[in-house]
C-alpha cells in the first residue's frame, strides 16, 4: 500500500527552482480504504539527520493494516530516504516490508561519482552494484524533489511528465499525464486540486496501465489529497486524514 502511495506522489511540471514547498517537521497521515473496508494508515514525516557527516533530510514513510483487514492480509511497510537539502539527490534508500508474508529488506546507497547504486539485499545477504541514470530519484525522495523544483502554474491539460527513478535494482522512466483541475470535498473542506493519471504496469497488482488517479492540492504545499486505484481484485482509495508542520497555508474553500 505504501509502495503505491510513494510512487504516485511524483507529479509536477518542470520549471525553474521555486520557494521550498516543505520543511523539517512536516507530517502527513493517510487513511486507506480497500473497497468499503478501512484497511490501513500510511504516514510520511520529514526529519533532520546526518549521513556520513553531512546534514540531510531524512523522510520516514510507514504503512500498516489495521483492524479487520489485518486478519486477512497483514501489511507492515517501512520506507526511508536520506537526501540532499539543496539538490534533493538521494544518498540512501531503505525499503523494509512485510505484505502478507511477502518480505523485502533492502538498502540502496547512491554513488554519483561512479554513477552506481549499491543494493544491499539483507534478506538474501547479497550486495550488487547497478548503473544509474542522471538525475535519478528513489520512490520517496522523488516526491520532495518535485515539490521543490517543479511548478504547475501553467501546466496544460494532456501534458505528460517523465522522471528517472531507481527501484530495487531497476532504472525506469515514470510517466504521468495532467488531466485538469478539480475541487475535491475533504474532511477539511473543499480543496482546489490538480488531477493526474500515473501510468503503471498492468499485471500482478493493477487492472490496467491507466488504473490510477491522483489529486494534489493546487497551492504551494502540493499535498497529495486523494489516490484512487483499480486493482485486479477490488479497488483502493487513500485520503489525507491529518497533517502538521506545513510550510505554507493550506488552501481550503469554506462554504
Question: Residue ranges of each PLM-predicted region?
Answer:
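Bacterial Sec-dependent N-terminal signal peptides
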Residues: 1-18
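Acidic, serine/threonine-rich low-complexity disordered tracts
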Residues: 16-112, 152-255
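Hydrophobic, well-structured mid-protein blocks that either form specific transmembrane helices
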Residues: 104-150
